[in-house]
Amino acid sequence: VTIPPAPWEGEWNHTDDSRVSERNKANFKIELENVVRSLKNHPSIIQWIVFNENWGQFSTMENTQKVLDMDPNRLVTAASGFTDFEIGHIQDYHSYPYPTIGTWYPGVPTVDYPTTRRIRVVGEYGGIEYNVPGHTWYPNPSGVYDRPATSVEQLTMRFTNIAEWANAMAKQDGLSAAIYTEIADVENETNGLVTYDRKYDKINIGRIRPIIEY
């Protein structure tokens, strides 16, 4: 039985060199080197991420090795989310709403490289929207990762559920870190734990504290 590709599979399958012009490749390499060289002594930087979610991803091994050579004192992630290569210090998955280790978008290729030499993390999970009128940048934000919550109580319950899932993965699957999307609302997304203006807590902080301090 032949299963046809999903309609969007062609978009995601261009993961290494495809759809990146030679001009853009050359510009990326120049900017990559300039950014690392100019900022590598900044104390607040703890990690370099070369590519995010296949966006313009090309020559992953070469570009990541360049960063490793330029700054041997920091952690380096080759690709945050999606197409992974066995290089760098961290294997990073993106998964919504629950944290998972593997592919969550049909048609997104991943390579199951061994993780015995690398840290395994979920770099993005959660994304539960809760829109508080009067506290947003746009009147009708459009960024939605999962079905919206409608109250502080509902967001607290759903956050608790998926955060406990992440804690279980730390015990059972060797997960070293999980990053919730996101701490605060941004311009076009209301999936934060506080509003864009930082004036309204959208979640019960006291109830989630024991979970996030796990």
Regions found by a protein language model. Name each.
Residues 1-203, 207:
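Substrate-binding/catalytic cleft of secreted carbohydrate-active enzymes
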Residues 208-214:
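Long, highly charged low-complexity segments enriched in Glu/Asp and Lys/Arg with interspersed Ser/Thr
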